[in-house]
């Protein structure tokens, strides 16, 4: 019983050097070692910390760098989609262009070359019409299917097949070059202040032409229709054309100027056609003013004509009458006529409804002469001995153009003698020269 076991002996009486490594002394000298990697492969199970953790939303907001990269990729995607759509559209259009080119070549083959130019007289139905050419009679022809029927109207210019004369195209109506030349692009420099006297004439033309274009509501309030046109008549040089220039300067309306002799054309029908084109352009550019100078060239009294030229002039005048007072309202188009011989005009041209106001331009009186001399000598360097009252009070019949010619001639005489001032003697010589040429060149009693 007194003997212990071997294990007991070791624990109690063993030597110090016989201690095991797992003793208390080894725990103090041992360093920390990380735990070994888990041998389990798979997702780590998260520990639940109660119902609060299950209800909380996870924080999945991306960082700023990730957001910028996402926007960049979206923009690249948009560009790629645009490129894809563009390529697909080009692929679809390529056969269409080839087909259009093929159709165009077929149309050209059907039209033939060369093509004739004619005029459409009447449309019978959707596929047939009556046409005429400048050198032949009228024909009943067909209209090809590719011709735009909406643009076909009687009187328009068309393209016809060279052999069968069918309608194969339409010529777009453009402005006649002669009418485009008649349009005054730059306003004249003359104004109402440059006109000496003629206060009553200026007032009348303002009421008949200028005021209806600028304030048409005044005529509507009073219940009247403004005049369609006026005629200016009087002796040469009394200011008819000058007043028309002043009207063009004072208003912003389109101004078309034509001389009566320009309406007389060589070929049959060209004169009336030019009149129609003139008023058509004026209607398109309205508000506008049509000024026809020397209207007596085409507006003379009608009589039995024996030549083709005289009959053509009468046709031109009839077309002018139709344009002045036809079924179509002129609207904002005003007409100004000017002539030296109103007694030779046809009464139908001067009746109310066509020309509602007739404005007479008499020779200037003493007050008007003085004003005209002041206007034309305002920029001249005059000597001290010049007395314009002598020329103002003279009994000779001066027109405004004569007074201007006297002032111009006096300045030329001063330049001839190397002088920069115009003397009284220069005016006297200029007056004698101008009046002598006037009496010599005009037959007696022409403008009585």
UniProtKB/Swiss-Prot annotation:
Ranges of Basic and acidic residues composition bias in the record: 17-33, 93-111
Pfam families: AAA, AAA_lid_3, Prot_ATP_ID_OB_C
PROSITE patterns: AAA (PS00674)
Subcellular compartments: Cytoplasm; Nucleus
Chain residue ranges for the region called Disordered: 1-56, 93-112
One annotated GO molecular function: ATP hydrolysis activity
Record key words, sorted: ATP-binding, Cytoplasm, Nucleotide-binding, Nucleus, Proteasome
Superkingdom of origin: Eukaryota
Predominant cellular place of this UniProt entry's protein: cytoplasm
InterPro entries according to UniProt: 26S_Proteasome_ATPase, AAA+_ATPase, AAA_lid_3, ATPase_AAA_core, ATPase_AAA_CS, NA-bd_OB-fold, P-loop_NTPase, Prot_ATP_ID_OB_2nd
Residues at which ATP binds: 234-241
Segments forming a coiled coil: none
Any one cellular-component term (Gene Ontology): cytoplasm
Bias kind Gly residues: ranges: 1-16
Sequence similarity: Belongs to the AAA ATPase family.
Role noted for this protein: The 26S proteasome is involved in the ATP-dependent degradation of ubiquitinated proteins. The regulatory (or ATPase) complex confers ATP dependency and substrate specificity to the 26S complex.
Protein name: 26S proteasome regulatory subunit 4 homolog
Phylogenetic classification of the source organism: Eukaryota, Viridiplantae, Streptophyta, Embryophyta, Tracheophyta
